[in-house]
Amino acid sequence: MAHRPVGAGSSFNFTAGTASTSSAFSVQSSVVRVVAVGGAAFVAVGATPSATNADYYVPSGGTATLALTKASNRVVGVTTGTTTIVTVPEGTQVPFGVGDYITLSGSTYHNFTHQQVLSVDTSAGIAGFFESRMTVNYNSSGIVTSFSSANASVTASNKVSAYGTGAGVIYYQQVQISGDA
């Protein structure tokens, strides 16, 4: 199989008997490739993973390709407050559910990373709104600048967690897989 890198790869250290977790990343591909170096690890991928010895095993020097679920949409509005309301274009749906974690990018003032979706409102015509909206657990009350961005988008956000059988490093990279190499 041939792998085509998507975005930037990253790494983090892990130790024996403890779950270590990466920083958040926006899901841009349907696969993440994981390599364990220096020690074996059990690996979990998700919004708030905490790997245990019951998760996917990657031997020292071994690799694994694990599935991700991509989801994204354009952003046409942001309402600031102690929680933040993100509005997507009319005629589209919010591709996230309650409990998912998302990242908003492409806006000068309203960007945030890895915040939890608290609710999704898809009702039509309420208070003159026909767009789908979601409430996010992000305090944007300090932002007084109006939202104005033609390039803002919201994407699913995940982390990688590793529970080591010894000490080592996890390298991870989102990839596209194409045929046989």
Question: Would you name each region that the model predicts?
Answer:
Residues 8-28, 49-50, 81-91, 109:
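Surface-exposed ligand/attachment interfaces on beta-rich extracellular proteins
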